[in-house]
Amino acid sequence: MDDTKKPAPRNTGETLACLIIDDPLLKPTYGCLDYRKLLGEMKAHNFFTEIAFIPYNYRRSDPETVRLFADNADRLGICVHGCNHTSNEFGGGDYRRLRELAESALWRMEEHKKNTGLPYDPIMVFPQGKFSSTAMKALRDAGYLAAFNSKITATDRQTLPDNEYQQPATKIYHDFPLFLRRYPEDRADFVRDVQWGRPIVVVEHHAAFKNGFRAMTDLVDWINTLGNIRWTSLLNIAEYYLGEKAPDIRPKTRPSPERLRARLKIAVRRRLSEARDNYIETNDLMTRIYRLIRG
């Protein structure tokens, strides 16, 4: 085995790192996020960003933005973020339904790859951070390499042994690896990640960049002082810490269409979420009104 693919030794060697931004479409701008400006910051401060891409949007990517990703594969990548990104999408216990969602998401990502030429990482980032232990089995059986999430407690298991938090990834759910990602304010935990031989995985959303990238680049600069940090994709992180290569994605059959009512509900939800991101969260006054209304 290539030494670079072996699990990272604790307290020594490289620490791999990545910034994940949830939800954005591949458009020149999305909400407060401008991809070209982000790329400039990544080059100046030496970090990598992975977009948690919603498979529902597989036919909506902008060709110019796709080229930007393809031309800068050392700085930008995409992974799988749910399937339709509906509420508690992967939090239930129906294996058949969860397997259908997992397979449908991969089919859409394969179609996106076929239509745009842009590869993706067979990594799942759960919508709203919700997943069940059964969902982990469904992902494993569908051919994903790993999942990344902002917590490692499932909807049907709220406590885990302490040692599960001390590993690069937990495999407590059906022997399928789950990596923990963190928000920028969790600096003490990032230090512990380095000490325990875990990757540093930062999560944010587009609204974090309303006032520019300074807060994020300050965090990146600080992370880069913690040791031998190498920023890279989630695929590379998973392969490195698991000591195994991602399996080839088996051909997927086109998923059966949802019923009309379900399709309309999903479409409305996605458009409303995008309207919030693009027209409300980009404006301070509108954001305050929106939060007041939502309580």
Where are these regions (language model features)?
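C-terminal active-site subregion of NodB/CE4 polysaccharide deacetylases
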Residues: 1-28, 137-269, 273-283
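Active-site beta->alpha N-cap acidic-glycine motif
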Residues: 2-75
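Loop/turn elements at helix/coil->beta-strand transitions in domains of secreted/extracellular proteins
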Residues: 14-16, 45-50, 74-77, 118-121, ...
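Well-ordered, non-membrane alpha-helical segments in soluble/globular domains
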Residues: 31-41, 61-66, 95-108, 212-222
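Short, well-structured alpha-helical interface segments that form or flank functional binding sites
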Residues: 33-37, 119, 130-134, 197, ...
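Alpha-helical structural signal in soluble globular domains
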Residues: 41, 45, 68, 108, ...
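Metal-dependent polysaccharide deacetylase catalytic core of the NodB/CE4 family, i.e.
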Residues: 48-136, 153-159
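Conserved anion/nucleotide-ligand pocket segment
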Residues: 280-294
